[in-house]
Amino acid sequence: MATLPPTAHTSQQPVNIEDEDGILDEYDQYSLAQSYVVGGGRKGRTKREAAANTNRPSPGGHERKLLTKFQNSERKKAWR
């Protein structure tokens, strides 16, 4: 079995963005420096806006489903 060669760096230290000037071009530095990388996919809304505008489960259950079934049955009775 072949063994892997030892790595050159024994301790991994986080590299600062300014230290990587030779490695990264200006577009890479811009994309790493911007805060939009951290945000989540929330349709452009804040957590508060998303919580205020979501469909919450009804404590009564399937009220809309029962109502539409009742309305459709009444409509069928009136049609006959």
Curated annotation (Swiss-Prot):
Q: Where in the cell is it found?
A: Nucleus; Cytoplasm; Cytoplasm, Perinuclear region
Which segments show compositional bias classed as Basic and acidic residues? 61-80
Q: Which residues form a coiled coil?
A: none
**Keywords annotated in UniProt:** Cytoplasm, Nucleus
* Modification note: Phosphorylated. Phosphorylation promotes DNA-binding activity. Acetylated.
| Gene Ontology molecular function | acetyltransferase activator activity; chromatin binding; DNA binding; transcription coactivator activity
Q: What does this protein do?
A: Transcription regulator that converts stress signals into a program of gene expression that empowers cells with resistance to the stress induced by a change in their microenvironment. Thereby participates in the regulation of many processes namely cell-cycle, apoptosis, autophagy and DNA repair responses. Controls cell cycle progression and protects cells from genotoxic stress induced by doxorubicin through the complex formation with TP53 and EP300 that binds CDKN1A promoter leading to transcriptional induction of CDKN1A.
Q: Which family does it belong to?
A: Belongs to the NUPR family.
Name-wise, this protein is Nuclear protein 1
Source organism per entry reads Rattus norvegicus
